[in-house]
Amino acid sequence: MAQLSVEQFLNEQKQAVETALSRYIERLEGPAKLKKAMAYSLEAGGKRIRPLLLLSTVRALGKDPAVGLPVACAIEMIHTYSLIHDDLPSMDNDDLRRGKPTNHKVFGEAMAILAGDGLLTYAFQLITEIDDERIPPSVRLRLIERLAKAAGPEGMVAGQAADMEGEGKTLTLSELEYIHRHKTGKMLQYSVHAGALIGGADARQTRELDEFAAHLGLAFQIRDDILDIEGAEEKIGKPVGSDQSNNKATYPALLSLAGAKEKLAFHIEAAQRHLRNADVDGAALAYICELVAARDH
Amino acid sequence: MAQLSVEQFLNEQKQAVETALSRYIERLEGPAKLKKAMAYSLEAGGKRIRPLLLLSTVRALGKDPAVGLPVACAIEMIHTYSLIHDDLPSMDNDDLRRGKPTNHKVFGEAMAILAGDGLLTYAFQLITEIDDERIPPSVRLRLIERLAKAAGPEGMVAGQAADMEGEGKTLTLSELEYIHRHKTGKMLQYSVHAGALIGGADARQTRELDEFAAHLGLAFQIRDDILDIEGAEEKIGKPVGSDQSNNKATYPALLSLAGAKEKLAFHIEAAQRHLRNADVDGAALAYICELVAARDH
């Protein structure tokens, strides 16, 4: 794909994800306030990087990305639930997310907890409902298994728990990497891995794509830490320097700003190399990789 | 089964569930405090009525209940997560559960939220991991789909959200029944339905067992409300009359105590009738039904 058509592809897919997410909430028969709270955070915007990784991987393997749409939405629901719960007063106690009041600020803590619980549970339902002809039962089961592992007590939840436990302590680089590999890495990796499963990647492609995603995940987090120091407040939608003032371990704090930038470049290069080795139509994935390296919010 | 062997069967199954639950947590590679928080509430006791309903239904259909054990544990994990989240300060704000300090009292709010999130996610993983030979992929997918529906934003989470919204308001009987059918009913019904799926029930048996479970679920809740008035504090492990003092809608409040007892008897009889109509070896299910009618905690 040419650069222009890559951008167009990603814009179209992002739109498809956002339309599908809204429909999935609309069709629910449940208390109105619960639906509103779930929709509020799902529709609060964001880069939709996880669904786009999945859909771009499916596309890179020559399959119709529409087949992966429900799984892409499931991933975004789980990502969104994690943001809602992370923002709670007893967790990170954030009032703003993407420049808007956080879920509990609008709907109250109880409803925010329930909206998160609802999104997490609903995500699994979406994958079960896909037609057997589009994704066979055994592959859907594998998709659910890997999603639960990526999101659960050996994945994202483990990362968040380690993050909570590490607050106020001086972390080593390996402890910091444990947190990031779990808190954000596992779900980013899952996004690509699920795309490989849906797209029918062979063993070698799957291995290279998994490596691509692992490096991309670390790059993503390092960039996040750098942005916290360099980014403009209005662009990232939260107070700049909040990590420093919260005394949180970050890559720049452990490696210096220059060292963090070097590490970012290393992981981006490694990601691009593994992507090339995967021998897929990876233009959209390469473009996402560039966006992560250069993103300013 | 004779009465004695029924009691023995249920005790053995309860033991099997508790052993399996502990093993499932032990095997996790994750932060120690997260595992402790998850295990604490899982191991806090309770009647294990949901897993026992599932395993007794599998047994009633002539199959080995061991086949259903991972699904029984998944149900108990989801039930336990819901208790942890319901007890949080922003929800019911309970300090005691089964006579022991609630999860957030011991591990803090953040870890309690994460323990709940972890249990919910892990529950789905357990079902995916069952061998194809024991439960085929298409049935496992159905089990996951129904579990997500029973627990999610059209099931248990909807009931809890409606309950939160109804606090301090005067509810009608139909609003109260909506809350109970969702908050506790859906998961009790799922327990029997999952047993029917695993045990290979035919359409008529499934229908009768579903009806059995629906009536049992309502009976369970009515008995709970009656206990809140009549029960001894040390037996139920929370202050007696807490519903009244919290101004919560209950069956006795809406129907009088005598009216509630009449309704309890009606649902127990209907449950037993549907169980007989299912033409299964239902001794253990009938016994659980009697326990619900007579339970004093």
Swiss-Prot record, chains A, B:
Protein known as: Farnesyl diphosphate synthase
InterPro entries registered for this protein in UniProt: Isoprenoid_synthase_dom_sf, Polyprenyl_synt, Polyprenyl_synt_CS, Prenyl_diphosphate_synthase
Amino-acid positions noted as binding Mg(2+) 2 in the UniProt annotation, renumbered to this chain: D86, D92
Positions of Mg(2+) 1 binding: D86, D92
Biological processes annotated in GO: isoprenoid biosynthetic process
Result after altering C289 to F/S: No loss of activity
Binding site for isopentenyl diphosphate: K47, R50, H79, R98
Chief location category: cytoplasm
Co-factor binding comment: Binds 2 Mg(2+) ions per subunit.
SS bonds (residue pairs): none
NCBIfam families, A to Z: FPPsyn
Catalysed conversion reaction: isopentenyl diphosphate + (2E)-geranyl diphosphate = (2E,6E)-farnesyl diphosphate + diphosphate
Classification of source organism: Bacteria, Bacillati, Bacillota, Bacilli, Bacillales
GO CC annotation: cytoplasm
Subcellular location: Cytoplasm
Cofactors named for this entry: Mg(2+)
Family the entry assigns: Belongs to the FPP/GGPP synthase family.
